[in-house]
Amino acid sequence: SSAAAASSETDSASADDGPTWDIDVRSYETHERVEHYVRTFSGDASTRIADRLSKGTRYEPMIREKFRKAGMPEDMYYLALIESGYDPHATSRALAVGMWQFMTSTAKGVGMRVDWWVDERRDPVRATEGAIVFLSALQRQFGSLYLAAAAYNGGPGRVSRGLSRLDQAEGATRDDLALELVDGSYLPRETRNYVPQLIAAALVGK
């Protein structure tokens, strides 16, 4: 009957509520800086973001599988979008190299080879493995994926100092604290923008 068909369509629609994430984007999607970057990534920068996401499809299965096997959220895939646009040969002005933008000392600290003959920062697989080692250590240190992301960008010392100065709201989660650091002047501007960019990239990327 038509009623049964309508019911079936409703059931089908409710079964597909759109994209899901394994990092907490919903709690922060109305944060002012997140909204700003969602608008930017969907508007003025949409062509550039689309190009970078297209480039990332080559590496996405590998990155997601490695994060999953390490027991970390697959959607940290979007961190490499912010870092390099999935470019294995990217080099920053600060001489961070590769898809995951490692400085030489950090790369060596997580077991990557960087010398005259081999630079594993430019190897998408080895660099992803190194990023997972580094992010896992930072997550254990700070108890939050978003604080770990901030420390990945700005360094754990800066995040620790910022947390020590922060007037922490009662009942705030560790992830909440990452966004509270964003709202203050506790971190350099690039690092303050980093977590909102990650959340916005995940929202727009899916």
Predicted regions and their residues:
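Short helix/loop segments within enzyme catalytic domains
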Residues: 139, 143-156, 160-162
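Solvent-exposed, polar/charged alpha-helical surfaces in well-ordered, non-transmembrane soluble domains
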Residues: 61, 65, 77, 129-136, ...
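Solvent-exposed loop/turn segments at secondary-structure junctions
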Residues: 84-87, 106-109, 155-159, 204-205
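Substrate-binding clefts and substrate-entry loops adjacent to catalytic sites
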Residues: 37-54, 86-93, 101-147, 168-186
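Short, functionally critical alpha-helical segments immediately adjacent to catalytic or ligand/cofactor-binding
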Residues: 72-88, 148-155, 199-200
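Catalytic cores of secreted or luminal carbohydrate-active enzymes
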Residues: 189-206
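An acidic, Gly/Ser/Thr/Pro-rich helix-cap/linker signature
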Residues: 1-71
